[in-house]
């Protein structure tokens, strides 16, 4: 009998709402169903790393996978990267903009590869991180709620995600040294004006307008230093979206970290709930009718929240971008509004909440598409 090929799925750091562990175990289950011998290896940097890695050295694996990995920076006492002592291609599944992972993606490994959630971000890594050998854009899968969902036909929109006060982030930008401060403020203006403009494209345009050039390695370093731009854009548009709904007297239920910092123009239409671990988020989505997505940091890609809604028969109301317009049918599988014309959000939300047959039709279409393409 032929021996099964081996795969290790790591979880080397906990990402928000304990999602790294959840993703690792979902991926492992999916690989096992395909006939692989799969191990899940969860640890953090406080663990005995010798005990974690020594048993793996010299062994052959079809795939080594991690999420926003810390392993790429780990070395033995003689300077040898631990991943170079394991025989197999390593893929780092990057779950936010690669600019946050400058050191990890620059690691001098024999077989470093990357998976991304956004096509423009994949192209960015191809150009600016030559040590990454193979790249792939692939959305995360989604999971159906364990208990199943009984829809509550309430007049509210559910949003699940994190928030920070954009003014506080902008203050951080204002305190930055030059030329970073000027670059970041101009980039913020550009991305507010054009929400589907990739940050790296905007930075190249900005440099050209200033008559300046940067070599590729310095360009990536500057991008890493300008991380507050991406953080600001996320929260600027999340605030704008919730403000728009509340102004239109459409109730919003906010579940996640940081929403106590949100100041509403009409608190009567805002409900805040404590965050839940990632695995329980599907239960809340399964009992909701309409799920809001605001993810301008993946403006040529797809946030997993979209597929979570589709998997749990919850109508997804998402900011549009070219990638989503290509892979999903607007008005049939999801509903797309424009961040540039935020009034389209409240118009669409009001239509969905007043037309339950349309909601059900979209939910059923979306669930069929999820089962066909977006399971783990």
Regions found by a protein language model. Name each.
Residues 8-11, 15-18, 22-34, 39-43, ...:
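Catalytic binding pocket for nucleotide-activated donors in carbohydrate/polymer assembly enzymes
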Residues 3, 11-19, 23, 133-299, ...:
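Nucleotide-sugar donor-binding catalytic core of glycosyltransferases
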Residues 82-97, 113-117, 140, 158:
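Active-site proximal beta-strand in glycosyltransferases
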Residues 1-87, 223-228, 232-236, 247, ...:
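N-terminal pre-catalytic "stem/leader" segment of glycosyltransferase-like enzymes
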Residues 61, 87, 109-112, 132, ...:
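Short, well-ordered alpha-helix to beta-strand connector turns
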Residues 10-14, 42-45, 62-70, 89, 93-96, 290, 315, ...:
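Structural motif
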Residues 84-85, 102-117, 127-130:
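A conserved, positively charged/aromatic
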């Amino acid at each position: 009998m032929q021996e099964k090929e081996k795969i290790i799925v790591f979880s080397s750091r906990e990402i928000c709402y304990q999602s790294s562990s959840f993703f690792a175990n979902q991926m492992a289950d999916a690989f096992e169903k395909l006939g692989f011998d799969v191990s899940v290896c969860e640890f953090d940097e406080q663990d005995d790393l010798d005990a974690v890695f020594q048993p793996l050295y010299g062994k052959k694996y079809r795939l080594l996978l991690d999420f926003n990995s810390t392993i790429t920076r780990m070395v033995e006492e003689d300077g040898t990267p631990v991943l170079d002592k394991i025989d197999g291609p390593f893929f780092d599944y990057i779950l936010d903009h690669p600019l946050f992972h400058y050191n990890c993606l620059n690691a001098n490994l024999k077989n470093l590869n990357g998976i991304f959630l956004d096509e423009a971000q994949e192209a960015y890594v191809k150009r600016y991180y030559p040590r990454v050998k193979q790249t792939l854009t692939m959305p995360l899968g989604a999971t159906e709620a364990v208990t199943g969902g009984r829809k509550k036909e309430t007049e509210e929109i559910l949003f699940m995600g994190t928030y920070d006060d954009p003014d506080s982030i902008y203050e951080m930008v204002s305190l930055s040294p030059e030329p970073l401060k000027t670059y970041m403020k101009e980039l913020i203006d550009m991305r507010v004006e054009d929400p589907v403009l990739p940050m790296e494209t905007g930075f190249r345009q900005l440099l050209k307008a200033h008559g300046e050039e940067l070599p590729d390695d310095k360009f990536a370093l500057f991008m890493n230093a300008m991380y507050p731009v991406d953080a600001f854009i996320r929260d600027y548009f999340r605030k704008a979206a919730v403000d728009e709904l509340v102004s239109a007297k459409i109730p919003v239920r906010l579940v996640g970290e940081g929403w106590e910092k949100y100041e509403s123009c009409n608190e009567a239409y805002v409900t805040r709930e404590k965050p839940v671990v990632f695995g329980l988020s599907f239960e809340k989505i399964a009992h909701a009718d309409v799920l809001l997505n605001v993810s301008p940091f993946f403006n040529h890609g797809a946030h997993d929240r979209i597929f979570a809604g589709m998997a749990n028969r919850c109508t997804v109301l998402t900011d549009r971008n070219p990638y989503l317009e290509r892979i999903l049918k607007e008005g049939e599988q999801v509903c797309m509004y424009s961040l540039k014309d935020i009034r389209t959000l409240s118009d669409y939300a009001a239509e969905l909440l007043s037309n339950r047959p349309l909601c059900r039709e979209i939910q059923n279409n979306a669930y069929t598409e999820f089962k066909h393409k977006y399971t783990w």
